[in-house]
Design a protein with these regions (language model features):
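Long, distal/terminal scaffolding or interaction modules
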Residues: 3-293
């Protein structure tokens, strides 16, 4: 409705402002003002509608277990999304029992691997993955497993992974990119190093980082707990000395039990070298970890 716009009085007060021509900006263009072309996200040729969902459809409908194995590539940006939607539509927020629908994938995953995965859906990927892994995670389980021990030292999950996650579990057997777990409100995640701006605006959940973090860690974090195993605790505290962050030791048995449980699950799913080393000397875990709230 550009017909409701008019020149501001501020644009007549000075010689330069008065010279600005705004007529072409507020001219009402001719033509329809409703949508003329339907959006087409090409889901009909995507991975989920052609492979995972058809394979798992009857198991979802009947609540039975299903396991499938697939090779995927970085052009497929819907892995697990349609299947997860089908679970949520039929079973609502409760979803299915854990690991009911279990998909093994391998290769170079595209964006949004296992996005919005609900409870009952597990995606176990061996390889690497682009941005937005597990974004909006809603109760499901996501595993990104390095294909070999050398890859554990590299970035195998892209930027903005687990953005807005609310529930669920994730195990990343390598490093992740920037803005990891921002706006996480309830997911429990293990990763082996992250880039800048990690855990921004986090409000809930638990994140264990078996390695170093980038700059601006925990900015705006107002809830949840993270346990960091940096190469140097002293350096970590120095670099990340924000007024909004509180550092402390892990003193209570309940906390140690939680860390051990998450690391055991991480090792079970990924055979992580770092997790194994920490578990082998877990009686001294307080010396290697810093709690951040």
């Amino acid at each position: 409705r550009t017909d409701l716009l008019q020149r501001s009085s501020k644009l007549t007060s000075g010689s330069k402002a008065a010279a600005i021509q705004i007529e072409n900006l507020i001219e009402q263009s001719e033509g329809p003002n409703t949508k003329q072309i339907m959006q087409d996200h090409h889901l009909d040729i995507g991975f989920d509608l052609n492979y995972l969902y058809p394979d798992a459809k009857h198991s979802i409908q009947n609540g039975h277990s299903f396991t499938g194995s697939y090779v995927i590539n970085n052009e497929q940006r819907d892995v697990g999304v349609i299947t997860g939607s089908a679970i949520a539509r039929q079973y609502g927020e409760k979803g299915l029992p854990e690991d009911t629908i279990f998909a093994y994938t391998e290769g170079h995953a595209g964006q949004s691997l296992a996005a919005y995965a609900p409870h009952g859906l597990t995606i176990h990927h061996t390889g690497d993955a682009n941005d937005y892994v597990g974004k909006g995670l809603s109760g499901g389980t996501v595993i990104v497993n390095a294909p070999n021990e050398e890859r554990e030292q590299e970035i195998i999950a892209g930027n903005v992974s687990f953005y807005g996650a609310s529930r669920g579990k994730a195990y990343i057997n390598g490093k992740a990119g920037e803005r990891f777990c921002i706006r996480n409100s309830g997911a429990d995640v293990v990763v082996e190093g992250i880039g800048d701006h990690g855990l921004e605006y986090m409000t809930g959940g638990h994140v264990i980082i078996l390695g170093d973090v980038g700059k601006n860690f925990g900015q705006g974090m107002s809830g949840g707990v993270s346990y960091i195993f940096p190469s140097s605790i002293e350096e970590f505290k120095k670099v990340n000395a924000l007024e909004t962050l509180e550092f402390s030791e892990v003193r209570y048995d309940e906390e140690k039990a939680l860390i051990k449980e998450m690391l055991e699950a991480h090792y079970k799913h990924t055979r992580s070298t770092k997790a194994r080393q920490i578990l082998n000397q877990f009686e001294n875990v307080s010396q290697y970890v810093v709690k951040v709230i």
